[in-house]
UniProtKB/Swiss-Prot annotation:
<protein>
    <recommendedName>
        <fullName>Glutamate-1-semialdehyde 2,1-aminomutase 2</fullName>
        <ecNumber>5.4.3.8</ecNumber>
    </recommendedName>
</protein>
<dbReference type="GO" id="GO:0006782">
    <property type="term" value="P:protoporphyrinogen IX biosynthetic process"/>
</dbReference>
<dbReference type="InterPro" id="IPR015421">
    <property type="entry name" value="PyrdxlP-dep_Trfase_major"/>
</dbReference>
<dbReference type="InterPro" id="IPR005814">
    <property type="entry name" value="Aminotrans_3"/>
</dbReference>
<feature type="modified residue" description="N6-(pyridoxal phosphate)lysine">
    <location>
        <position position="268"/>
    </location>
</feature>
<keyword id="KW-0413">Isomerase</keyword>
<keyword id="KW-0627">Porphyrin biosynthesis</keyword>
<dbReference type="InterPro" id="IPR015422">
    <property type="entry name" value="PyrdxlP-dep_Trfase_small"/>
</dbReference>
<comment type="pathway">
    <text>Porphyrin-containing compound metabolism; protoporphyrin-IX biosynthesis; 5-aminolevulinate from L-glutamyl-tRNA(Glu): step 2/2.</text>
</comment>
<comment type="similarity">
    <text>Belongs to the class-III pyridoxal-phosphate-dependent aminotransferase family. HemL subfamily.</text>
</comment>
<dbReference type="GO" id="GO:0042286">
    <property type="term" value="F:glutamate-1-semialdehyde 2,1-aminomutase activity"/>
</dbReference>
<dbReference type="InterPro" id="IPR049704">
    <property type="entry name" value="Aminotrans_3_PPA_site"/>
</dbReference>
<dbReference type="Pfam" id="PF00202">
    <property type="entry name" value="Aminotran_3"/>
</dbReference>
<dbReference type="InterPro" id="IPR004639">
    <property type="entry name" value="4pyrrol_synth_GluAld_NH2Trfase"/>
</dbReference>
<comment type="subunit">
    <text>Homodimer.</text>
</comment>
<dbReference type="GO" id="GO:0005737">
    <property type="term" value="C:cytoplasm"/>
</dbReference>
<keyword id="KW-0663">Pyridoxal phosphate</keyword>
Length: 429
């Protein structure tokens, strides 16, 4: 493939945009560098770059585009609303309709509020949990990304009883000292952390199915134990379902797993491709939020009619019969095919799959927590990424990210992807 125009535009972008990208995950730094491909158009399961190359897209904008690019039903809804105005600064009926559909799908959202991103959603759940409990400390699990607000950009201490340290320049040490980080799926470490800090913990942040160091499911009983222990100490359980809501079935992961939090943050998919975030949960907790309570949250763009209209249209697509069964079928076909090729070429790799999402790790052990994902071979992934890209397969440029299937992917797309992987693996010796 030729990338001449992408390289030219990326060089121009470097003159005006810091680092040439508006989010660091879009750079190719984690896969050895080089100019990221500049895309021009998306249609269904495909992306087209400025050089005219076509890609089968498994990045899907890091998750939101579950119905594929430019889905006609969602596009029509956006066009209709844009003609009526995109922002009023007043309540609209669309907010009510969208909230009703969300609560029907995710019953734990007794009351909810809309914001504009997953970062805002998680940030606000922390504020609300602190207001409700009158406590300050937060527990999070290593490797889970909860947005770029200060409190969640914190690295683990040397053990569960140790406080965190800043994971980004500009995060004060005093902020990091309010966060305890423990390994996912390690209930003994969680018990130890709560033994030391439980009476000061406002909330634990949990991805019920992890999506930020690949797709990692909870061990049986882990989420139930986290709920029980947290509530024993008077803390709240907050689920970050920014990636997982509507990813695996029509609803949230909590409904699939039958384990429920006190508060939930959501985003990505539910906006139909437009900026969105939201949070909700128990009514008594949510009543801490202004104008009813003392915890302040506001936003000029929050609940804007364009995102509400797109979200409603998105749910109308996903609630159709057979959508998630087909995603699961294609996901299994892709997983099985990749595993056959791994065996054929004697590649050291393993796959985690949850329905229509999967992660290929270049490691010989099953990944159940962050350290195992971190130890996967990044150089091998970088080589695989570039070999696939040059055959028209668009993956996330990071060994930690998932491959996302959409309602538009077909058997033929899976077969083309497997042919590309066959060649890529053959070149990795």
């Amino acid at each position: 493939m030729e990338f001449t125009e992408s390289e030219r535009l990326q060089s121009l972008s470097d003159e005006y945009i810091l680092g040439g990208v508006n989010s660091p995950s879009r750079s190719y730094k984690a896969v050895g560098g080089g100019a990221p491909v500049v895309m021009k158009e998306g249609k269904g399961q495909y992306l087209y770059d400025v050089d005219g190359n076509r890609y089968i897209d498994y990045l899907q904008a890091y998750g939101p585009i579950i119905t594929g690019h430019a889905h006609p039903h969602i596009t029509k809804a956006i066009q209709e609303q844009a003609a009526k105005g995109v922002l009023y600064g007043t309540p609209t009926e669309l907010e009510i309709k969208f909230a009703k559909k969300l609560r029907e799908a995710i019953p734990s959202l007794k009351k909810m509020r809309f914001v504009n991103s997953g970062t805002e959603a998680v940030m606000t759940t922390i504020r609300v949990a602190r207001a409700y409990t009158n406590r300050n400390k937060i527990i999070k699990f290593a490797g889970s990304y909860h947005g770029h607000s200060d409190l969640v950009l914190v690295a683990a201490g040397s053990g569960p009883s140790q406080l965190g340290s800043p994971d980004s320049a500009g995060v004060p040490k005093s902020v990091a000292q309010e966060v305890i980080t423990v390994p996912f799926n390690d209930i003994e470490a969680y018990k130890e952390a709560m033994k030391h800090w439980g009476n000061e913990v406002a909330a634990v942040l949990v991805e019920p199915i992890v999506g930020n160091f690949g797709m990692v499911e909870p061990k049986p009983g882990f989420l139930e134990a986290v709920n029980e222990i947290t509530h024993e100490y008077g803390g709240l359980v907050v689920y970050d379902e920014v990636i997982t809501a509507f990813r695996f079935h029509y609803g949230a992961a909590q409904d699939l797993l039958n384990v429920y939090p006190d508060l939930t943050a959501f985003g990505k998919i539910v906006g139909g491709g437009l900026p969105i975030g939201g949070y909700g949960g128990r009514q008594d907790i949510m009543e801490q939020v202004a104008p009813l309570g003392p915890a302040y949250q506001a936003g000029t763009m929050a609940g804007n009619p364009l995102s509400m209209k797109a979200g409603i249209a998105l749910l109308e697509v996903l609630e159709q019969d057979g959508v998630y069964e087909e995603l699961d079928r294609l996901g299994k076909k892709l997983e099985d095919g990749l595993n056959e090729l791994i065996d054929k070429h004697d590649i050291t790799a393993t796959i985690n799959r949850v329905y229509g999402s999967l992660t290929l790790y270049f490691t010989d052990e099953k990944v159940t927590h962050y350290d195992q994902a971190e130890n996967a071979d990044g150089d091998a992934f970088a080589k695989f990424f570039k070999l696939m890209l040059n055959q028209g397969i668009n993956l996330a440029p990071s060994k930690f990210e998932a491959w996302f299937l959409t309602t538009e992917h077909t058997d033929e797309d899976i077969e083309e992807t497997l042919r590309a992987a066959d060649y890529a693996f053959s070149q990795m010796k």
